[in-house]
Amino acid sequence: YSYVKAVFNEYKEQFKTMTCGTSLMYWQGQEEQSDDVVEFIKAVSSQFPKMGKDEALLLMAHGTPQVSNAYYSVIQAKIDEMGYKNIFVYTVEGWPSLETVMPKLKKNGIKHVTLMPIMMVAGDHAHNDMAGKDSDSHKSILESQGFKVNTYLHGLGENPAIRAAFVERANDAWDALQGRKGADADHIKMMK
């Protein structure tokens, strides 16, 4: 989101009017706003497999060195608050890593793991880093530690509720651009 805001600021003088909408997970339920993280979890929960006591779901996120990486802790906390058991968020390029999550799996007696990307597209990271045949893929690492591993190779863009959330944000941004009443007040808007 900080990148989008930087691009917005770079080009704002080239347009008569411009607005920037909010990201998929922006609000956290404060000040009468929606809880986007809870709505996100509800949306992706339609993809969660049924799990027994010795099964876990690992949600693979991208990760970043930016401060926004802390949002993955918020997602994990909300998953826990919502009562989901043995669902863990980890990242390819940030914290928590797969290595951070594996001790939790062992502690909880997990034997079977499903890996699922929480990325818009199940692309290179999902097919290679997560589910690849190389010894350093997440699937191979988990298998080498004795876990049975399934993979779910679908991106968030395939989820109708996620697509609807993006359409809603685009409509909110349009309403803010048009100065419509009730438009989300946190949109960045610039008018000449």
Regions found by a protein language model. Give the residues of each.
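Extended amphipathic ligand-handling, pore-lining, and cofactor/metal-binding catalytic surfaces
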Residues: Y1-T114, M119-K192
